[in-house]
Structure formats: C-alpha cells, structure tokens
Design a protein with these regions (language model features):
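Non-heme Fe(II)/2-oxoglutarate
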Residues: 1-15, 33-35
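Hydrophobic, well-ordered secondary-structure segments
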Residues: 1-6, 83, 91-94, 99-101, ...
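Catalytic core of non-heme Fe(II) oxygenases with the double-stranded beta-helix
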Residues: 21-107, 124
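Histidine-centered metal-chelating micro-motifs
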Residues: 35, 111-115
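Short, loop-centered acidic/histidine patches that primarily coordinate divalent metals
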Residues: 76-78, 109-111, 131-133
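Extracellular and organelle-lumenal recognition/adhesion modules and their flexible linkers in secreted
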Residues: 114, 119, 126
Length: 138
C-alpha cells in the first residue's frame, strides 16, 4: 500500500480508508520446457507473483551457444507507439524481463500483459500467484 500512497500522492487519511482484498491465489509449478503464454488478469486491479523456488532460472547458454534468460517473467509495455525523442528512449523497450529470485514478491497492474518465458531445468520452478483489488472501508 506504500507504493499506492506514494505514486498517487494520497494522504494518510485517505490511505486509512483503503483495504486490500485478495480475490484468488494459486500455485504454478513449471516443469522442464514449461512456460505460460502472454495474458492479462481481468476483473481485478493487481496481480502478484511470489517466487517460492526458482529452480534453475537465470542466464543460460543454449545448445547454439546463445546466451538467454531462463524462466523469467516478461512484462510487455502497454505503450503501443513511441517517439525516438532522446528524452523518451526508455519508452522504446517493448518488454521487461524480471529474473526470479527465491522469496521475492512482484506486484503489477492486472491490465499489464505478461508471460513466463520457457523454463529449462531438472528441478521445478514454483510460484504462488494472486489477484487482488483495493476496497474502501464502509
């Protein structure tokens, strides 16, 4: 809730009226060569991923000798068009990869298109995901 407060410049009084509401959660176990296609979470405000066991995620060199990221979560930019103006080069990236780390929680807007890139490993990659909304106290 601290992020919500700071990003929106809400005062303590307003924040005291907000209550996070966990709508659903599930475990996702990714085996060797598993992945999760790009998707969004509908009818919710926030999505989250908690990395329980990242298995063998990280940088790997594939059989062709190419360095790639293994088992990352990819978040796609909601900005469809951008300018090449030097002050806005950060907008030119169409996706950001988050490299999983055990015990880390990632929270993101549910409308953000995201995926789990292919995972290659002998041990499973285990995450707990959830959807939530923010309600106002009654």
């Amino acid at each position: 809730m601290t992020v919500v407060k700071n990003v929106n410049s809400y005062d303590d009084n307003y924040m005291s009226q907000l209550v996070p509401d966990l709508r659903e959660s599930w475990a996702h176990i990714t085996n060797n060569n598993g992945y999760h296609d790009a998707h969004k979470h509908l009818n919710t405000s926030w999505g989250g991923i908690y990395y329980v066991d990242t298995g063998e995620c990280g940088e790997v060199v594939d059989e062709d000798g190419i360095l790639r990221m293994n088992g990352t979560n990819r978040f796609y930019s909601p900005i469809q068009y951008f300018t090449l103006d030097a002050s806005m080069t950060y907008l030119s990236h169409d996706a950001v990869d988050i490299s999983p780390e055990n015990g880390v929680l990632v929270i993101f807007p549910a409308y953000l298109l995201h995926s789990a890139t292919p995972y290659i490993g002998k041990t499973d990659r285990v995450v707990i995901s959830f959807n939530s909304i923010t309600n106002q106290k009654t």
